[in-house]
Amino acid sequence: MKVTLPAFEKARVLVLGDVMLDRYWVGPTGRISPEAPVPVVKINQIEDRPGGAANVALNIATLGGQVQLAGLVGDDETAKALTLGVQTLGVEPQWLVVNDKPTITKLRVLSRNQQLIRLDFEEEFDSASSQALFKQSEAMLDNVDVLVLSDYAKGAIADPRAFIAKARAKGVTVLVDPKGSDFARYHGASLITPNMSEFEAVVGPVKDEADLIEKARQLIKTHEFSAMLVTRSEKGMTLITADEPELHIPTVAREVYDVTGAGDTVISALATSLGAGSTLAQACAIANTAAGVVVGKLGTSTVSRIELIGALASHQGESGFGVVSEDQLAYAMEQARLRGERVVMTNGCFDILHAGHVSYLKQAKALGDRLIVAVNSDASVKRLKGDGRPVNQVDRRMAVLAGLAAVDWVVPFCEDTPERIITRLLPDALVKGGDYKVEDIAGGAQVIAAGGKVEVLGFEDGVSTTSIIQNIMARQ
């Protein structure tokens, strides 16, 4: 299945559930305590990261989605640290403060990238607090397309059935990351995402693939779920619906470094993809890729759109060169700069490629290690050149350019000038051919402000697309 990323910024998601603070104490260890047979860790680094439902919200924000977050916290310093953590990515949380309970905290002690111990500071919230949270959050359902219930069995989602029904009645897709052995609590959800151990806690041991599918479909029927996605560690994921063939997606993780928060990443990628218009199958494939990225990181982490683009390109066998999207190009440029390569960019219509173009592009490539050619769309060329142009459609123009040895990447743009795309990409050098003045080149000021250079190269005299067209017309 060919996977393409949707416009994540279109997704509007409400995340409601058990929020917590993941705190890390990190330091070296070189001796055993004389008091007990345990290592002594000299702490030299302390880091706080949003966890649980808060990590789901951060993952959605990192991908570019619009996200609202609701959860239960205590009246303490930990709540302030958690608030600060989610605000770093523009998420304004809607907490319900429970004065007699602490904000849930998971403290992990690490040394040499290994977790030595985890200490949990928590008390389960009561059902009254949970129902108050649901009531406080009802109005938020009017402004979202997807609801994520992130359940860690800490009390924030005591009985969500009425809230799920209200969300579905408003046309909101409801995703649940479940906990515990009672899936009846999530009756009517659109999609539920148990891992294998959570699934078997409900249905008992699974003998084989057929048994898994049968038991999943029974749960779907009993609890009126639309679908179930069972995450299966090294075996990937399996998507089951009531009456369609199951879809198995193999794992894409190259290295498993830390599984902390992997489930959060899965459901956040699902929510953002579905909210942006992906099909369920596409959303599951995107979530699978995101999980493969995040398990290669230490601790509770997020996955960016650029990381997803790189992972998808790698798994789908794409070279990273030739005709690319803007997102693919942004990732490719990032990788090129990590290799110490200088990136040059130029732009134009390139309607009928001729010797003057080829000579110019060779000169441009000589100014760096990699050359980007941004190409005007068909509509843009028509606005600039008039009726009858372009002679060649943009796909054909880009294919010819991509075949030149001097050109590394070709990307289309639809505006009359390339200022927007240049401002986004900010190449090390921006090149234009002809008699332009540097100060008149679109995007030049932005490149210079970022520390880059802008240069003007000459075109070969007497050679142009217009003259070629005129010569052809004269011979007819």
Curated annotation (Swiss-Prot):
Record's keyword terms, sorted: ATP-binding, Carbohydrate metabolism, Kinase, Multifunctional enzyme, Nucleotide-binding, Nucleotidyltransferase, Transferase
InterPro entries per the UniProt record, alphabetical: Bifunc_HldE, Carboh/pur_kinase_PfkB_CS, Cyt_trans-like, PfkB_dom, RfaE_dom_I, RfaE_dom_II, Ribokinase-like, Rossmann-like_a/b/a_fold
Gene: hldE
Enzyme Commission code: 2.7.1.167, 2.7.7.70
Family under the similarity heading: In the N-terminal section; belongs to the carbohydrate kinase PfkB family.
Protein name per its UniProtKB record: Bifunctional protein HldE
HAMAP family noted in UniProt: HldE (MF_01603)
Ranges where the record places region Ribokinase: 1-319
UniProt GO MF annotations: ATP binding; heptose 7-phosphate kinase activity; heptose-1-phosphate adenylyltransferase activity; phosphotransferase activity, alcohol group as acceptor
Reactions it catalyzes: D-glycero-beta-D-manno-heptose 7-phosphate + ATP = D-glycero-beta-D-manno-heptose 1,7-bisphosphate + ADP + H(+); D-glycero-beta-D-manno-heptose 1-phosphate + ATP + H(+) = ADP-D-glycero-beta-D-manno-heptose + diphosphate
Pathway(s) served: Nucleotide-sugar biosynthesis; ADP-L-glycero-beta-D-manno-heptose biosynthesis; ADP-L-glycero-beta-D-manno-heptose from D-glycero-beta-D-manno-heptose 7-phosphate: step 1/4; Nucleotide-sugar biosynthesis; ADP-L-glycero-beta-D-manno-heptose biosynthesis; ADP-L-glycero-beta-D-manno-heptose from D-glycero-beta-D-manno-heptose 7-phosphate: step 3/4
UniProt cross-references to Pfam families, sorted A to Z: CTP_transf_like (PF01467), PfkB (PF00294)
